[in-house]
């Protein structure tokens, strides 16, 4: 990396002229910190909004422009529809004209539902279900023979194979698992002269009134005939089957009394095994529908089973040394678990101090899986005396699995889930569907095999698949849609993904690009897209594909507003808006707007200073040598990692890089962090799979700083999260006035009764429900928004009340509490990470992702470190302007200079060039990634 800034030539142009007939005009925007902003934006262009973190970019793009576009659309709906959609508050703006319907694409909406896959998220799977339903060839799931249509004679022959004198009834399934009262079908059955009907397994006489619940799925079967197998029944049976087929669109059910029911279809059946396949419908291929989902795993493809290795993670320990780490089975003196362990030890020859590795095979099996029918002697002691009784022992693992199934407590489920692992379903082998659905093929492969191919392979298959001329004509429109959507995924660099990949396992960059590809596939025009930092998590190579995708969306006739700090995106944009000049109260203005050249000319634009090369992040003259010790992850094989062994040298700033999907988060977050957290911090998270992590003796603690919010309610704020508010409350309780009144620290909390205003319960605002209008938030009439009651506000420190302190910015509070070291140190760290502009009492819900992450970083910086701490940060430059990145790098340097180790997953070149050591994973994403990293150059990645 060069030690001098690269100055890309800025195209010199006059100020961009905006067509007055094709523009978006914003007047008087005052949302959050915006200062009465007036702005004109060109329509049908790629617009980038940039500026320091907290400058007001998101307030303008999302909370003003997008919010108003969405609100206007919702207000056009009926009041009946609006009650299900919730209300959107009108942004604080005088007027916006030229708006289109708005769609937001951010990274916070990745699905964590285990049923969501790449195929379902992109809606490609819906087209595949239709394709297999229309041109699929059914086969017998047992013998694999192609299934053809059945005639009435073949159905009669199959029924006549039943033993002599077998009683059965012929049913016509007119409704199958469908919501509604089914009154129309029941009336039709009455008019046709039928006497009985079976509804949801219960028999009814059609002469009586049958009332069915409207919102529950029902199955309705008309009883056509009741028969007994004998030599004379064949003719009547044939007539009854024909009648049932006519009533139920080619389906008939033979309900054998005391036996298994038989279903026949005029459509398809295997003559050898008698397996009938009903008419192929799209729902047969849905793993989210009972008609298609595997019955054993209900369409998940996996089972959660208790893992013995997680129940006893370290067999070198004894039971008394807490070898058993499972909910309800921790060792404690006087507990039922201790009594059970003693009884098992007496029977199988071990004590509470015997290491588990020395247990006999029989003893370990009894401990984990129970004693079966054998009763063992239990000795129970209590304050009322002792007693002996004999009882069977269920076993730790069966006990945990039973409690997991039966409990209604989410907390208990989460506790037990810590010792469970996911196993492939033995029935469908992870394919999610019923055998009959998996036995349908197109071009020789079933739908699960198709989805297991990569996007690139699927495109090749569709282009070369051999189908009949008739099927080709029927499937042509479906092939076209599938090919287009697969092509869009390939064009955004996701050709390595499979459609069966779980959506929850996707990285932020992958999920963002999938949603972009889906929008291109929808081919909408005249839409306003608002994107939140789409380059987050993207390697420079992937970024080029992303920019091309956004341009393609623009070329369809849409307007794109992108909140972004990436330099390449800015240089490729049609129009740039720089919000600033500073952050918080120092921002909220339009510093510059126009082309890159226009931005570079504006002296007060910090963005312009970096784009023009006047400012830059320096490359260090020397690299740190570290302390000579290292953490080593041996043979990591979680997700796509290919048994790689990686060294993390201690005492250095380490960057883990690689293209999107190459395995960075798996290696660092899932394996290294979770293993260290379990060993050093006592965390109970489940680490990813590797042989061992060596070198943990050189580290005393690990701290992970992720991108999740610091709180989800307005009551959470930076002061409460960092703990500084506790110190401030203690300070107020130590004032002379507070002592005279007998006030403790709790009096100054707005979350508990005593000192808070009870009218608003310490919130400072009241919510007024307006039903079909947005809720209105007004300051509390009693406390005037100050959160506390009058008596509490009479206590002051340096002429400031506790409410005044919450309203201070970090910058102001640093000066105010300069003489209180405990408070000043915590506030100073907030200032160091660039959060001097936020208020101490600012609601967590109003903080951006970048701000929330830096609050966490400041919180960790304020703690005392020993110089042997490992800090792990995932994309710390998220939401950061290059000026903020400059400041962040200095903070990270400070941590490493104190002897600590900082490991960052990062694509930002300004951070990478400051690293002492670089680990580059790849070479590709998905199955093409996870390969052993190349050894760094002699100077540690310069």
Go through each PLM region and give its residues.
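Conserved phosphate-binding elements of NTP-dependent enzyme cores
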Residues: 1-942
């Amino acid at each position: 990396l060069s030690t001098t800034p690269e100055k890309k030539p800025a195209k010199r142009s006059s100020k961009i002229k905006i067509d007055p007939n094709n523009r978006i005009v914003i007047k008087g925007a005052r949302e959050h910190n915006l200062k009465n902003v007036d702005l004109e934006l060109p329509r049908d262009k790629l617009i980038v909004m940039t500026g320091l973190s907290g400058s007001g970019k998101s307030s303008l793009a999302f909370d003003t422009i997008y919010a108003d576009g969405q609100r206007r659309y919702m207000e056009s709906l009926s009041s009946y529809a609006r009650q299900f959609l919730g209300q959107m508050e009108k942004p604080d703006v005088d007027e916006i004209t030229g708006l289109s319907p708005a769609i937001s694409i951010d990274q916070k909406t990745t699905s964590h539902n285990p049923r969501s896959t790449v195929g379902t998220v992109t809606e490609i799977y819906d087209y595949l279900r239709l394709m297999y339903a229309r041109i699929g060839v059914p086969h017998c799931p047992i013998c694999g023979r192609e299934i053809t249509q059945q005639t009435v004679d073949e159905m009669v022959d199959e029924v006549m194979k039943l033993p002599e004198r077998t009683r059965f009834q012929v049913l016509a399934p007119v409704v199958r698992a469908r919501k509604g009262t089914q009154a129309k079908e029941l009336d039709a059955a009455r008019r046709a002269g039928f006497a009985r009907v079976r509804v949801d397994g219960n028999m009814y006489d059609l002469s009586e009134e049958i009332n069915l619940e409207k919102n529950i799925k029902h199955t309705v079967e008309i009883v056509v005939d009741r028969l007994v197998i004998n030599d004379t029944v064949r003719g009547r049976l044939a007539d009854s089957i024909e009648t049932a087929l006519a009533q139920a669109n080619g389906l008939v059910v033979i309900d054998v009394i005391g036996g298994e029911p038989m279903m026949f279809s005029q459509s398809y059946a295997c003559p050898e095994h008698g397996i009938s396949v009903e008419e192929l419908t799209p729902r047969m291929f849905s793993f989210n529908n009972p008609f298609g989902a595997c019955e054993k795993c209900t369409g998940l493809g996996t089972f959660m089973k208790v893992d013995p290795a997680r129940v006893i993670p370290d067999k070198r320990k004894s039971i008394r040394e807490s070898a058993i780490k499972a909910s309800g089975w921790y060792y404690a003196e006087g507990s039922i678990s201790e009594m059970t362990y003693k009884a098992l030890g007496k029977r199988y020859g071990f004590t509470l101090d015997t290491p588990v590795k020395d247990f006999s095979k029989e003893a370990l099996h009894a401990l984990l899986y129970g004693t079966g029918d054998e009763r063992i002697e239990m000795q129970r002691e209590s304050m009322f005396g002792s007693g002996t009784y004999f009882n069977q022992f269920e076993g730790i693992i069966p006990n945990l699995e039973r409690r997991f199934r039966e409990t209604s407590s989410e907390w208990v489920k989460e506790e037990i889930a810590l010792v469970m692992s996911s196993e492939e379903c033995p029935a469908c082998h992870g394919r999610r569907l019923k055998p009959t659905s998996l036995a349908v093929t197109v071009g020789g492969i079933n739908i699960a095999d198709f989805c297991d191919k990569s996007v690139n392979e699927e495109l090749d298959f569709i282009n070369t698949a051999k189908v009949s001329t008739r099927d080709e004509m029927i499937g042509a429109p479906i092939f076209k849609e599938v090919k287009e959507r697969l092509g869009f995924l390939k064009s955004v660099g996701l050709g390595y993904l499979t459609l069966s990949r779980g959506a929850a396992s996707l990285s932020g960059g992958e999920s963002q690009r999938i949603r972009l590809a889906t929008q291109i596939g929808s081919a909408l025009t005249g839409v306003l897209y608002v994107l939140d930092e789409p380059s987050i998590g993207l390697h420079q190579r992937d970024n080029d594909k992303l920019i091309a995708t956004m341009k393609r969306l623009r070329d369809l006739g849409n307007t794109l507003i992108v909140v972004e700090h990436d330099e390449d995106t800015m240089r490729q944009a049609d129009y740039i808006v720089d919000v600033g000049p500073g952050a918080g109260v120092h921002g909220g203005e339009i510093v510059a707007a126009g082309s890159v050249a226009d931005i570079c000319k504006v002296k007060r634009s910090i963005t312009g200073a970096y784009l023009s090369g006047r400012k830059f992040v320096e490359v260090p003259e020397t690299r740190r040598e570290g302390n000579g010790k290292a953490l080593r992850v041996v043979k990591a094989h979680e997700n796509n990692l290919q048994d790689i062994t990686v060294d993390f040298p201690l005492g250095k700033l380490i960057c883990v890089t690689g293209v999107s999907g190459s395995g960075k988060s798996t290696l660092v977050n899932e394996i290294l962090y979770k293993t260290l957290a379990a060993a050093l911090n006592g965390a109970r998270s489940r680490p990813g799979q590797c042989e061992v992590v060596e070198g943990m003796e050189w580290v005393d603690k690990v701290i992970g700083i992720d991108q999740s919010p610091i709180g989800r309610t307005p009551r959470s704020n930076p002061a409460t999260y960092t703990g500084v508010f506790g110190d401030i409350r203690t300070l107020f309780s130590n004032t002379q006035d507070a002592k005279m009144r007998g006030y403790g620290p709790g009096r100054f909390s707005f979350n508990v009764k005593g000192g808070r205003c009870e009218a608003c319960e310490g919130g400072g605002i009241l919510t007024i429900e307006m039903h079909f209008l947005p809720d209105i938030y007004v300051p509390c009439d009693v406390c005037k928004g100050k959160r506390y009651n009058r008596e509490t506000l009479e206590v002051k420190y340096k002429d400031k009340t506790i409410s005044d302190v919450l309203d201070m910015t970090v910058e102001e509070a640093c000066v105010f509490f300069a003489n209180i070291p405990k408070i000043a140190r915590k506030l100073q760290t907030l200032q160091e990470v660039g959060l001097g502009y936020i208020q101490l009492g600012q609601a967590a819900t109003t903080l951006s992702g970048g701000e929330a992450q830096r609050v966490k970083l400041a919180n960790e910086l304020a703690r005392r470190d020993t110089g042997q701490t490992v800090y792990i940060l995932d994309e710390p430059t998220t939401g950061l302007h290059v000026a903020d990145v400059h400041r962040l790098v200095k903070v990270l340097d400070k941590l490493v200079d104190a002897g600590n180790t900082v490991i960052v997953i990062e694509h930002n070149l300004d951070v990478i060039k400051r690293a002492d050591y670089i680990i580059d994973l790849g070479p590709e994403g998905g199955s093409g990634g996870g390969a052993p990293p190349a050894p760094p150059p002699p100077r540690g990645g310069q």
